[in-house]
């Protein structure tokens, strides 16, 4: 399973809720969360993976060492007591890893699932970072082979959930390069219904704080943030701090200004990293352009040529500023950045 959406859109909330529901239904399973935020090399990945898996299977140094001896024999993996005490690292490498090391490590969850006689869920966070390792192609192909060859009737399967916040990098893996083709189902998060968000905000203020939050103001927040619940909650929390009995439009404007002041350094860093052509194409997106290679668009926004347009689009995708939907229409990934770059940077009124 793959889940790729921008940051703070509910990926991990969905995963945690699903696991909670399974446990609530009496389903027994093991789970490991492999946080790949700082993975840059194959060694980083293998150590992160092994540490997460072993933590879910044991709880003492002797047990960790036993897992390494039993399941990772004839590899470069060792349980290093010093590394464990100083870095909380349950598995270490005594040499550069080879593909035998990779395969043995990737098979570790299945071995543990068989021992425990229960399904095993591996949750990858920021899965796209594995592409920073030079050997990513070999690793992906090995994972594909393992998924293809596994016994579908197995009572204790290993299930991989590959999540990531870099939308275009994840699309590159699953849609463009087509790794794990027909092996992984993509779960797209649907926007939370606007009516539910409005009800959540209005009732939350009334029942929780005894305050009034006008439905029209809540609707405006939903439209501004495109129903991004994290941003709506952020705005609502500031409105709560500013208000005593009821939230006014002026308070909401002040709350939005406070949010902008918090996020503006990040937004300034984004635009400072863009070239003139990239900024021009971003302006075209804000103006509602969808056909960037049209001659009048190239001339109006000084984009030089169709070939240059393709390069600029790819650059903005790589920088995770925009993505393109199934209709090949541009979408700015961060709704608050979209508001800021439109109203503050380009001063579009």
Question: What kind of feature is each model-predicted range?
Answer:
Residues 12, 228, 334:
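Short, conserved phosphate/pyrophosphate- and ester-handling motifs at nucleotide-, phospho-/glycolipid
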Residues 13, 159-206:
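Alpha-helical sensor/transducer elements of the RecA-like P-loop NTPase core
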Residues 21, 238, 315-318:
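Alpha-helical DNA-recognition elements
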Residues 114-123, 129-135, 139-177, 189:
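Sensor-1/coupling segment of RecA-like P-loop NTPase cores
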Residues 261-349:
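C-terminal leucine-rich, beta-strand-based interaction scaffolds used for sensing/assembly
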């Amino acid at each position: 399973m793959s889940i790729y959406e921008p940051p703070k859109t509910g990926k991990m909330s969905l995963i945690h809720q699903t696991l909670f529901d399974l446990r609530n239904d009496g389903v027994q399973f093991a789970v490991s969360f492999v946080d790949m935020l700082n993975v840059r090399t194959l060694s980083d990945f293998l150590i992160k993976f092994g540490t997460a898996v072993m933590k879910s299977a044991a709880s003492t140094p002797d047990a960790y060492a036993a897992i390494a001896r039993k399941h990772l024999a004839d590899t470069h993996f060792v349980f290093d007591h010093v590394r464990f005490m100083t870095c909380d690292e349950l598995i270490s490498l005594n040499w550069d890893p080879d593909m035998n090391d990779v395969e043995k490590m990737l098979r570790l969850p299945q071995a543990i699932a068989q021992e425990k006689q229960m399904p095993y869920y591996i949750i990858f966070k920021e899965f796209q970072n594995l592409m920073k390792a030079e050997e990513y192609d070999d690793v992906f192909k090995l994972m594909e082979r393992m998924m293809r060859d596994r016994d579908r009737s197995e009572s204790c399967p290993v299930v991989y959930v590959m999540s990531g916040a870099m939308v275009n990098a994840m699309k590159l893996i699953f849609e463009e390069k087509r790794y794990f083709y027909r092996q992984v189902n993509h779960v797209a998060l649907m926007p939370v219904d606007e009516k539910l968000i409005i009800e959540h905000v209005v009732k939350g203020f009334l029942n929780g704080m005894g305050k009034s939050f006008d439905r029209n103001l809540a609707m405006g927040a939903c439209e501004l943030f495109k129903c991004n619940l994290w941003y709506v909650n952020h705005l609502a929390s500031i409105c709560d701090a500013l208000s005593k009995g009821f939230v006014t439009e002026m308070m909401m404007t002040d709350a939005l200004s406070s949010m902008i002041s918090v996020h503006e350094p990040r937004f300034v860093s984004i635009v400072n990293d863009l070239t003139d052509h990239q900024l021009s194409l971003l302006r075209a997106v804000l103006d509602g352009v969808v056909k960037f290679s049209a001659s009048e668009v190239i001339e109006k926004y000084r984009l030089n040529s169709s070939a240059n347009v393709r390069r600029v689009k790819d650059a903005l995708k790589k920088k995770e500023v925009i993505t393109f939907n199934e209709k090949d229409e541009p979408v700015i990934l961060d709704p608050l950045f979209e508001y800021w770059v439109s109203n503050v940077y380009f001063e579009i009124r």
